């Protein structure tokens, strides 16, 4: 890290010169963000006049599938995974949700595609800060808005309404109107769980297994279900 003549900080990151324009102190991840600020921020992201060309990714659109879930559960049980029975109990619901996947996107534009609480936080000045755009690419803004409702409204229709209203008033182009609009969070959460399970299976230390079990339990403790989606669709 060195300073430019202007006093700005410059760092070499993988052979690329990167200049730091501003430091931000961020609060820890929090799903209880102000719904109006949140809705306006997501609308602002979706109104940026840039379509982009980084293509769609199966991670956000395609199911894991019944066969893969069955094989994964067999492996987890063979290794006595402590969460195997809890996951098995959710598989019927998981498969029912995966039946909602497969419809073409209503609209495509570059979206962040990872607006979970780890990447959207309150900054020291009280505003919201979005970072980690590594996964940005083409997606349906309606589906990204649905993912925001899942993360920050949980199953609270009133809070979901506040987020949607603020988003609409700020000119956001997405609309969450039906269960199929939740395709992005359904696919993404299921792939996250699958990845956590596979990492648990190959982990060689207790710490590694504990870390990946925690990943899986984030979903097990607050699963996305059809009833939760129905609650978020209430006007």
Identify the meaning behind each predicted range.
Residues 1, 98-144:
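Active-site acidic catalytic loop and adjacent metal/ATP-binding pocket
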Residues 1-15, 123-125, 233-235:
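Conserved NTP-binding catalytic cores of kinases and kinase-like/nucleotidyltransferase enzymes
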Residues 5-34:
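Conserved structural core of kinase catalytic domains
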Residues 28-85, 106-108:
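A cross-family kinase active-site recognition segment
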């Amino acid at each position: 890290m060195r300073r430019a003549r202007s006093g700005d900080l410059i760092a070499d990151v993988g052979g690329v010169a990167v200049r730091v324009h501003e430091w931000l102190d961020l609060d820890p991840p929090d799903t209880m963000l102000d719904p109006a600020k949140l809705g306006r921020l997501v609308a602002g992201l979706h109104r940026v006049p840039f379509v982009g060309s980084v293509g769609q990714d199966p991670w956000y659109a395609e199911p894991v599938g019944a066969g893969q879930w069955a094989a994964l559960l067999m492996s987890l049980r063979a290794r006595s995974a402590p969460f195997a029975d809890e996951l098995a109990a959710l598989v019927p619901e998981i498969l029912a949700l995966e039946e909602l996947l497969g419809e073409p996107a209503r609209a495509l534009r570059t979206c962040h595609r990872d607006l979970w609480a780890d990447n959207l936080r309150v900054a020291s000045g009280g505003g919201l800060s979005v970072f980690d755009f590594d996964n940005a690419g083409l997606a349906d803004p309606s589906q990204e808005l649905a993912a925001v409702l899942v993360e920050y409204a949980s199953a609270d229709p009133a809070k979901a309404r506040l987020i949607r209203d603020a988003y609409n008033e700020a000119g956001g182009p997405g609309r969450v109107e039906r269960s199929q609009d939740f395709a992005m969070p359904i696919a993404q959460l299921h792939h996250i769980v699958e990845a956590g399970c596979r990492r648990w299976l190959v982990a060689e230390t207790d710490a590694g297994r504990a870390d990946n079990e925690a990943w899986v339990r984030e979903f097990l403790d607050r699963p996305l279900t059809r009833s939760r989606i129905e609650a978020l669709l209430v006007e």
